Curated annotation (Swiss-Prot):
Stretches for region Disordered: 171-225, 263-327
Transport in keyword set: no
Role according to the record: Probable disease resistance protein.
Keyword annotations: ATP-binding, Coiled coil, Leucine-rich repeat, Nucleotide-binding, Phosphoprotein, Plant defense, Repeat
Modified residue annotations for Phosphothreonine: T293
Coiled coil: 122-183
Entry-linked Gene3D superfamilies: P-loop containing nucleotide triphosphate hydrolases, Ribonuclease Inhibitor
LRR repeats: 654-676, 677-699, 702-724, 725-747, 785-806, 813-835, 836-856, 861-883, 884-906, 907-929, 931-951
Family affiliation: Belongs to the disease resistance NB-LRR family.
Name of protein: Probable disease resistance protein At5g45510
Basic and acidic residues bias: start-end ranges: 171-205, 212-224, 263-279, 286-322
The species this protein was found in: Arabidopsis thaliana (Mouse-ear cress)
Amino acid sequence: MSDPLKMAAETEEIKPVPAAMGEKKDVVLCKKIVETLGGGGDQRVLLVGEAGIGKTRMAQMVDKEASKDVLCYQTLWLHLNRKFKVNDNYIKEKKFEDEWSLYENIASQLSLYSDFEETEVGERDEDEEEEKKVEDLLKDLKPKIEKYLLEKKEAVVKKLEDDKKKKEKEAAEKLEAEKKLVDPAAKKAKDHGNKNPTDAAKEKTTQVVAGGEDKAQTSSERKPYLLLILDDEGMTSEYEVMVHLGLEDFLKDHTPRKILITRRQETEEATKSGEHAEGEANDSQSGEKKEDTDGEDEIRSADKEEPESQARVKTEEKHEKVVPPTIDDLWGSTNTYGEITFQTTNESQDLLESFNLKEAEALFTSSMFFKDMPNFFFDPVPGTDEKLLNHMLKKSKSLPAAINVLAKSLEYTVKSKSYKLNKDEEERLLKEKIEMVLSAERGNPSDQESSSESPKKASGENPILLLAYKLFKTDGPLKDTILDCFWHSLDFFEHCGCVYYRDLITQWILEGYFDPVRSVEKAYQDGHSIFMELIDRGMLKIQENNVVVPEMAMRNVIDPRRGGHLGKSRLGFSRVYGGNKRKGIGKITQLDDMIKTVQAKKGDKITTILVSGDRLRRVTPKKFFKNLKELEVLGLFEPTVKPFVPSFSDQLKLLRVLIIRDCDLLKSIEELKALTKLNTLEVSGASSLSKISEKFFESFPELRSLHLSGLKIESSPPSISGLKELHCLIIKDCPLLQDLPNIQELVNLEVVDVSGASGLRTCFDNADGAKKNKSKNKNFYLLTKLQHLDFSGSQIERLPIFQDSAVAAKLHSLTRLLLRNCSKLRRLPSLKPLSGLQILDLSGTTSLVEMLEVCFEDKLELKTLNLSGTNLSELATTIEDLSSLNELLLRDCINLDAIPNIEKLENLEVIDVSGSAKLAKIEGSFEKMFYLRVVDLSGTQVETPELPADTKIHCLKRFTRADGKCFERDTWREIKEDIERDRSENASSSDAVVISQEITEKKPVEIREVESNAPRASDCTEKVDVNKERLLKVPIDRALYQKALTSLVDSKIPQEEVLEINETNKLDEEALASAEFVSFVDCTPERVKSIFEKAKLVKGCWLRMCFDIKDPFDGVDEENLKSLETLSITNLLSLETISFIAKLENLKNLSLDCCPKIKTIFPEMPASLPVLNLKHCENLEKVVVGVEVSTHTNLDLKVENCPKFGDYVMVDHSDVPPPHEC
C-alpha cells in the first residue's frame, strides 16, 4: 500500500449512508463524517456555509461521536474567531504572546498548568515577581502537553495490542478445540494445507475493525489518532495556526492527522480575495472546547460576500513544500504543509441538507420553552389549516441557529415578570406579533446587481431571526439600551473577534449606552443585566472562561433604527481596536466604583481606568494619577474637580484612549497636546469649552476616533484635516459651530456626524477673498468607507457631491444620509452613487424645492424615505424604482400637488401624506401593495384610492381618509366595506360638520384667523384641537399668535411666562433654567429630554402633537421634574405610558386628550394626584394595572369618549365625535 504521507490525494467522494429507520439526517451525517475522519491516512473535512446553518453544532456532534471510537485518543478544539498576529514581522521579531495564548488554551482543555501558574502569588520569589518571559513560559508548558498527549496515545496503542493478543489467543484456543473434534485421519490430510494456528488467528482478526463491520480499513491500516477541530476559521486561518504558531511541528508525533474545519462562507470568499487579517487578538482564550449550544461561533465577515447559499471548494495541485502556499492553496482539495498531504472532503452540501423540518421540530421541542408554550401555537394560521407552530418552523429556512434563538427568546418572554402579571393581554400581543412578522416575509429580489453588491439584503431577512429581534422589550428602566448593546455586539465581533465578557460590558459603557454615568458601578451592573438577557435570549453565546461570541446568524436582520448602530455609538471603538489587544482595554474588573485593569500579582501595572466624578472626588487628582504612569485607557464621567486636566496630562504619556464626558467646568484642553499617543479622544458635554487651537490635532497623528459634542466652539480646528487614520468624526450638538475641517481626503472615515450644529451654514470654506479654499469638502467620492453621514439640525445650504466624472465607483457603503431639519438646504446633488442607502431622511428641510430625477436611481436597498415638511412641488418619477421601500413619509409637504406612479412599490407598509394640503392626486393603484399597514391621507385633497385587494401581513390596518375619518380593521377588505358603508349612510360625515361648526363657534376670533391661514389637519385627532404645529409654520402676525397660544395653554397663566418650544427654535440658556411653564409642539423625544436636562423648575408643561413620543419623560432625570404641578398631553399619537409619574409628589393636574395608543397610564398609582382628565383615548382601559381607580376616593376623575375604559363611570357628551373621528 502507498504511503499516504507521500501521495498527493484527490478529493474523496463519499456515497451517502442510508438512514436507519427513524434516524435523523444530522445524526446520519455526523456518523458519516466520523467514518471519513477515522479512515486511513491524513483526513481533513470541511463544513462551509452561511451563519446559522449548524456548522459548530455538527462539530460538537462529531466530537461526541468520535469519542466512541477507541482509536480516537484525544480531541482538541481551537476557536479561530480571534485575531493572531502571525505575519512575517511576528516570526522575525520572535513575538511569543499569541503562541503562548494558543498553547495555554490547549493546556486548559487538558487541565494542565505551568509551574508559574500553580504557584501562589505570596509564595513566589522576588525574582519571579518580575514578569516572566513568555518564551520561558512556553518552554515550561509545551513539554507538559507533549507528555500528556503521548501518554494518551501510548495507552490506546497498548490497549489495542493487548486486545489483539487477547483475540489471537482466543482464536488459537478456539482452533485448538476444533482440532480435537475433527476425525484424526481427516485432520491429518487437512493439516498439510493449513497454516499454523497462530497465523490463522491473525488472518481472521485482521478482518475486525472498530465498530465490528468490514466497512472501513482494517485495523492494521487504521491507527490511533488525535482529532483537531478548527472552529469558525476566518479571523485566523488553518495555515497561520499550523505553520506560524508551530502547531504542525508540535504535533509531529501524532499522525495520522485528522482535522475538522468549520468556516463561514463569506469568510472563505474574503480570504480568497486576499483580505488577510492582521492585528493581535484580545486576551480571551480561543482554544477551549465549546459549550453545547446550537448555531455556531462565527465572527468574521468581509465587505464583499458570496451570494450563493452553498460553499464550494476548489481543487488545487500540490505545491512544493519549499514555497509558502498562497491563500488559494489553503482552500484546495489538498492542503500541504510540512510533510503531510491531506485528503480533503467537503461536507458543506450534506450539512445544508441535514437539517429539515423533522430536525427543526426535534430541536424546538427539546428546548425549555416547549413545556411552557402558550396554547395558541397549536391554533391554525389565519386563512389556513396549518398550525402556527408548524408554520413558524417552516419559516426557519433550515437554520438551527434561528430555531435556537427563537426558542430562547420566547422562553425569556413568557418567563418575564411583565408577561406573568398580565398574561392574557401579553399572550394576545405575542400572538399578534408572531403572526405579523411571519406574514411579512418578502420574496427574494431578482435584481442581479442587488444580489452581487449586497447578498445579505438580497437574500431577504430570515423571519424567525427577525421575530426573535422583535421580541426585545424596550419599555423597562433601560428602555432601548439593549438594542444598542445588541447591534454593537454584532459589529464589534465582526471587527475584533471574541472577547471576555467584562471587556464587552466596558465597551458598551465607553460607547455611551448607559449615559449619563454618575456611578461606574451602577453602569456596569446595568450592562451586566443586559448581557445576561442577551445570553438568555441566545443572542450572545458564552464559551469556557467567559469568552463571548454572538449568534452571527442575526446579521441577517437589518437594523431598522433611523440612526442605526453608528448613530448611537460615541466612539466606534471597534474600528480603533480592530482585534489588536495592544489597542484594546486589556483584562479588566469592576471594583470600588471603578473599572480598571486586573492585577493578577503584585506590581502588575494598571493600564485601564474608568471612573466617575463622584468617585474621583474622594482623592486628590494629582496624587491619584501620580502612580498611574503606565495608564493607556482613561474614562472620566462627569468629573467635577478642577483643574483636573493638568493633573494627568503631564504624567500619562502612554495614554491611547481618553474620554472626558459631561464636564461643565472644562474650559481648555490645550494641555492634552502632551498625550501624543492618543488614538481615541472624546470631549463631550463641556459647555464651558469655547476654543480649540488651530494646530491642536497635529499632536495626535494616530487618532482614529474623535468625538467633540456639547461644546461652545465656533470653529473646528483645521488640523483635523491631517488625521489620515481617522475612522469616526463626531462634532455634534455644537450650536455655535460655523465651519468644518476639510475631510474629503480622510479616506478611512466611516462615520461623519455634525448633527445639532444649528449655527453651521456651510460645509465648504466660509472664508472671504483670496484665502477661500474653493475645493474644501467639494467632493466626497474618495470616502468609499463612509457608512453614516448626518447633518441634521444644521443650516447648510448645499451638500458635497458624491461622484467624480473620471471615476465610476459607487459609494455603496453609505447606508444612512440624515438631513432632518436642515431648514436652509435648497437642493441636493446627485444621490445616484449612494447605491447602498437604507434610510434617507430629509424631513424638515423646509427650503428644499427640488430633487433630481437621478436621486432615486440605484436605490435597491432603500427602506425609509422621509420627505416630510419639505417644499417640494413634485417628486421624481424614478420613485417607482424604489422596490424595497417600506415607508414613504410625505407629511406636511404644503406645495406638493401630485405624487407620481407608485404602483410598483409593492413592499410599502406605510404611506403617510397627512397635512399636504395641496395634494390632490396619487398616481397608480394600491391594489398590489399586500404588505400595506397604514395609509394616512388626512388634511389632503386626495380621493380614496384603490386599496389592496388582498392582505398578506397579519396585523391591524389603518386608513385615514382626507376628511380625517379613521378606519381600523384586520383586513383591507373589511376597511373597504366600512368605507362603502360610510358612504352610503353618509352619517359620520354630517356629524363631523356639525361638530366642527360648534367647536369653531367656541374658539376665539384670533384662533380662527390663524387656522384660516393654516393647511388642513395632519391627523384625525386634529378635528377637536387647534393644530399648533401649523401655527408655528405659517408666517403670521406675532401678536396674533401670542393671543392664540394663550387660549391653547391656560388663560390664567400670563403668556410672557410660557416658554414656547419646537424642534428647532433657539432658546436662551438662562431663560430655560428659570422657566416655570413650557409648551412643546412637534418635538422629538430627544428634544424634550434635552430641555428637561436644563429646565429644572418647571411647574406647568403642555405637550402637543409630538408624534414620535412613546414616553414623554424617557431618559429624563426624575429630580428635574419634582416641581411639576400641571401636565397636559394632547395629540400624542404614539404615547404608551408615562414613566415614574407616581414619584412626582407635587403633581396636581393631569390631562390626556386624543392619545389613541395608550392603554394604561401609570406603572403605579400616584399618591396625591387630585385631578385627572381623560378625553378621546380610544384604547385606554386602565389607569393602573391591577388597581381600580374607584378605590381612590380623593381623585377627581373626568372621562370623555374613552370606550374601553372600565375603571370608572364615563361622562357621556352628545357633542363629542365618535372615537374613530377624534
